[in-house]
Amino acid sequence: MKYDIDKNEYGFDTAISASDWKYSAAITGLLYYFKELEKKYEIKTLTIDEITDNFLLYNKEDITEESYLNFIEAFYPEDTLVHKKIETQLKYTKEFTPEIIKNINKNISSNTVLKNFFSELKFDGTNKKEILDVLNDNKHLIIEESYKSKLYTNYCQVDKKGNSKLFESAKKNSPCRVRGYYFDPGRKSKATAYNFTSTSVDYFDDEVFDFIPFAFTGNSFETIFLNDNLNLEILESMNFKLREYFSEEKKREISNIMTLKQEKAMKEGKNEPIEETSVSVSLKKIFLNILKKKTDYIKYGMEIIYKNKERDYFETWYLRNDSIE
């Protein structure tokens, strides 16, 4: 849950606890955000409304639309935000060969968002500044639309017209923006709740849920989040390390697969290069490899939240204590 607190007493005006997995994920995303943008925060045990819990303390003023978009650009790699790849190609390529020009134009037209800005403009090898100016002048809009269509929509509601609650303050009794929790409180029935108890569903909305996407680790099709709502420092450490280990293990697996494919191609008399983009590794395989090698960073069994891009809901896995001993 999130609370307004006295800034004069605590040095911050907002406190948030990991009351369920949505708030745990939001806290993890907020921690990435605060660290990247060097904003002040504190993790502290407090008693609020007669509830003693571990809280993340921060100031509302440190969360702005502009900072959020800047964070998105810093957080995600070039293969996720293609405009970053285009900028890198234009800024650091010394000689624009026909093949490179073709590749840049391919990236420029790689998604609907970029097509809207470059419908009448193509790169010809001489108009680098013009392309970069378009990207720079429309950067935040490009980031926002790319993020909503490729990433945010996997975790929060975005309709066919691109409308969402991104950047919107939560209103009283407004439906939750998180996928699978989008119930109308005014019409909420027992059928929406576990064991037919209407109070068992936490359907309230909160603007901090906009930070949920950053908490998940994986690939473009499936992601996971390790939920520890007992200790925020352990929650932070586990998910930060998961992100690091996942990247390392993914690179290792892809390299192994590419080597095997290349060896097979050579045996068959083919001399075609194997592109990294043509190789995929399942999330479960990578995660199991991490558990075998890096169990030291997981302290005890816990809830794992899983999201498949093709499904409109989240799934829950459980990691038992005896499975990591």
Task: List PLM regions with ranges.
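Conserved small-residue
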Residues: M1-Y152, L319
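Alpha-helical structural elements
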Residues: I16, C176-V178, D312
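Hydrophobic, Leu/Ile/Phe/Ala-enriched alpha-helical segments that form helix-helix packing faces
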Residues: F34, S146, L242, F246, ...
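Alpha-helix boundary/N-cap detector
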Residues: I63, E95, N105, S109, ...
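Proline-rich intrinsically disordered, low-complexity coils
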Residues: P77, P98, P175, P213, ...
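Basic, glycine-/proline-tolerant helical and adjacent loop/strand elements
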Residues: K102-T259
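Intrinsically disordered, low-complexity regulatory regions
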Residues: R252-E325
